[in-house]
């Protein structure tokens, strides 16, 4: 069974949606997972054992309608059985439509019936866990009977990357036995970035409470 998961967005969204790939692999025997993401975001997906193939959506597909049409036709050649559209924008809707898959799943919107035959209401209220995680898990409800309430996404490193990271920590005298926090202070745009003074105070509080490095 071939399954296409579509998540065209920034690195954080691409990483988060790998939980869909993981849950599919763990619950559907012998499924083959193809993950369609924007080029430039693949670093957080490489080495992931739950992703069989990465399909890159290139900038030229946005800029050139003919190249986008060629890409759409190439999607049909994969003969996907199921498409899960996490992105739910015009491009991904067309990709879903051209896929020819018998099961097409996404969130419920006014025009969803034109592109999908399974639509899931988008949760607006937090139920004691990350809302972004919950909404992604809900997309699997037509396929998986028992779903977890929460799950964490992971980055999988190869041996050389692990060695490089260990050398970096040793060079900067960071104790690997103590908690290590990696915090990004910049969002993907200005309106998704906290004020620097506020972020500086937040980091200080995290460091003082958690005894992290």
Where in this protein do the model-derived segments appear?
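Catalytic machinery of carbohydrate-active enzymes
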Residues: 1-213
